[in-house]
UniProtKB/Swiss-Prot annotation:
Stretch list, region ATG8-binding: 406-415
Compositionally biased intervals (Basic and acidic residues): 126-135
Gene Ontology molecular-function annotations: protein-macromolecule adaptor activity
rRNA processing keyword on record: no
Record's protein name: Autophagy-related protein 19
Gene designation per UniProt: ATG19
Post-translational modification: Polyubiquitinated at Lys-213 and Lys-216. Deubiquitination by UBP3 is required for full activity of ATG19.
Compartmental location: Preautophagosomal structure membrane
Listed InterPro entries: Atg19/Atg34_C
Species name: Saccharomyces cerevisiae (strain ATCC 204508 / S288c) (Baker's yeast)
Length: 415
C-alpha cells in the first residue's frame, strides 16, 4: 500500500494526474504533457475508446461537480489544460453511458460547473466504491425535494432564450399598458396666470418676452435653459478631470529598461538538470528559442535545450529538463537565451542562489529584441508541428492497475 502511494507521488511530479471513468472501470492516469493527441493516445492504449459504433465522446469536469463539458476542439481542450496547469484535480468520462451511470448533465462552455448536493455526493461515492447502477427516476421522484434543490437546476441555453423572449414581450406589454393609463388618467391643465413687471430700461428683456406669444415658445425657452445648465456642469466636470489627469501624468515614473528580467530556478536531481523559467518581463518571449547552459569547469561544456515553438507569455511559467547531467553545479556557470536568429537576448550567471535573473546584454540593440518577438503560434490538434530530435526528452514509465500483471510501457516526448 505504501509503495503504491510512493509511486503515485513520483508519477504526479512527472505529469498531470487525471481520473478516467468508463461504464465499468475507474483508473488513475498520469498525462505527461498538455497535448491533446498524446492524451487521446494514452487513453486509447487501454482500449477504452473503441466500440462497435466507433470512437466515443470524451467529457471532463473538475472533481466533485454535477455537470461536465464535452471535449471537441482546441477551445475545449484549452479549458481542461488551464485547470491542470493550476494543479487542480480533473476527471474524464468516456461515452454518454458513463454520464448516465454517474447521473451527470452536459453543459456548454459558457455555463459554470455546479457543485454536488450532499445527497448526490453520497450516491456518487457509493457507486464508485460498489460500481452500483444509478438510482432509477422513479426512486428519485419519491424523495422529498429540499428548498435548496432548485439552486443546482441545470437549464439548457435554448430554454433560457425562450424565457428571455417571453420576458421581453411581457415588458413591452407592461410599458404599453402604463402609457395608456397615463393618457387616460391625465388630469386637465390648470391655467396659471400672473404678471411680472419688467423695467423699461431693460429693453433686451422687454423685446425678448414680447416675442413669446404661445406656451410652446415658453417651453422651448425652458428646455434650452436646462440644456445649458447640463452642458455647463459637464464642461466643469471634464475640466476638473483633465486637470487631475495632468497632475497624475507628472507623477508617473518611467520604468527603467534594465528592470526586465527572466527568472530561472535551477535544480539538480536524479542526474538531471531542471530549469523553471518565469517570464517577469513586460513582453512575450517568442518561440523557437534555445537555452544554453555552460558550466564553469576547467574544460567548460555547453548543454543546449530547444525551448520549442510555443511562446511564453508575461507572468507565465515553463519548465525544462536536461538529461543526463552528472556534474556538480558550480558558481560562475553561464545561462544564455538565444532567439531563432542566433542572437543572445538574455544572459545571466549561476551563483550561490538557485534563482538566476537573466537580463538582455548591453550590446543587444532594440531592433534585435523586437525582431525576436514572433506572432503567437496557433495551436491546432490536427496539425502539430514536427519535432526536432535535439529538442526531445524521452522517458519511459509503466502504467498499471492493482491486480494486473501485464504492464504497458508508455513513452512520450516532452519539449
Amino acid at each position: 500500500m505504501n509503495n503504491s502511494k510512493t509511486n503515485q507521488q513520483m508519477n504526479t511530479s512527472m505529469g498531470y494526474p487525471l481520473t478516467v471513468y468508463d461504464e465499468c472501470n475507474k483508473f488513475q492516469l498520469i498525462v505527461p504533457t498538455l497535448d491533446a493527441n498524446i492524451m487521446l493516445w494514452c487513453i486509447g492504449q487501454l482500449s477504452l475508446l473503441n466500440d462497435s459504433n466507433g470512437c466515443k465522446h470524451l467529457f471532463w469536469q473538475p472533481n466533485d461537480k454535477s455537470n461536465v463539458r464535452i471535449l471537441l476542439n482546441n477551445y475545449d481542450y484549452g479549458h481542461l489544460f488551464k485547470y491542470l496547469q493550476c494543479q487542480r484535480k480533473c476527471s474524464v468520462y468516456i461515452g454518454e453511458g458513463t454520464l448516465k451511470k454517474y447521473n451527470l448533465t452536459i453543459s456548454t462552455s459558457f455555463d459554470n460547473f455546479l457543485d454536488l448536493t450532499p445527497s448526490e455526493e453520497k450516491e456518487s461515492l457509493c457507486r464508485e466504491d460498489a460500481h452500483e447502477d444509478p438510482v432509477s427516476p422513479k426512486a428519485g421522484s419519491e424523495e422529498e425535494i429540499s428548498p435548496n434543490s432548485t439552486s443546482n437546476v441545470v437549464v439548457s441555453r435554448e430554454c433560457l432564450d425562450n424565457f428571455m423572449k417571453q420576458l421581453l414581450k411581457l415588458e413591452e406589454s407592461l410599458n404599453k399598458l402604463e402609457l395608456e393609463q397615463k393618457v387616460t388618467n391625465k388630469e386637465p391643465n390648470h391655467r396659471i396666470s400672473g404678471t411680472i413687471d419688467i423695467p423699461e430700461d431693460r429693453s433686451e428683456l422687454v423685446n425678448f418676452f414680447t416675442e413669446l406669444k404661445t406656451v410652446k415658445q415658453l417651453e422651448d425657452v425652458f428646455q434650452r435653459y436646462h440644456d445649458y445648465e447640463r452642458l455647463s456642469q459637464e464642461c466643469d466636470s471634464k475640466t476638473e478631470i483633465a486637470s487631475d489627469h495632468s497632475k497624475k501624468e507628472t507623477k508617473i515614473e518611467v520604468e527603467p529598461p534594465n528592470e526586465r528580467s527572466l527568472q530561472i530556478t535551477m535544480n539538480q536531481r536524479d542526474n538531471s538538470l531542471y530549469f523553471q523559467l518565469f517570464n517577469n518581463t513586460n513582453s512575450v518571449l517568442a518561440g523557437n528559442c534555445k537555452l544554453k547552459f555552460t558550466d564553469a569547469g576547467d574544460k567548460p561544456t555547453t548543454q543546449i535545450i530547444d525551448m520549442g515553438p510555443h511562446e511564453i507569455g508575461i507572468k507565465e511559467y515553463k519548465e525544462y529538463r536536461y538529461f543526463p547531467y552528472a556534474l556538480d553545479l558550480e558558481a560562475g556557470s553561464t545561462i544564455e537565451i538565444e532567439n531563432q536568429y542566433g542572437e543572445v537576448i538574455f544572459l545571466g550567471k549561476y551563483g550561490s542562489s538557485p534563482m538566476i535573473n537573466l537580463r538582455p546584454p548591453s550590446r543587444l540593440s532594440a531592433e534585435s529584441l523586437q525582431a525576436s518577438q514572433e506572432p503567437f503560434y496557433s495551436f491546432q490538434i490536427d496539425t502539430l508541428p514536427e519535432l526536432d530530435d535535439s529538442s526531445i526528452i524521452s522517458t519511459s514509465i509503466s502504467l498499471s492497475y492493482d491486480g494486473d500483471d501485464n504492464e504497458k510501457a508508455l513513452t512520450w516526448e516532452e519539449l
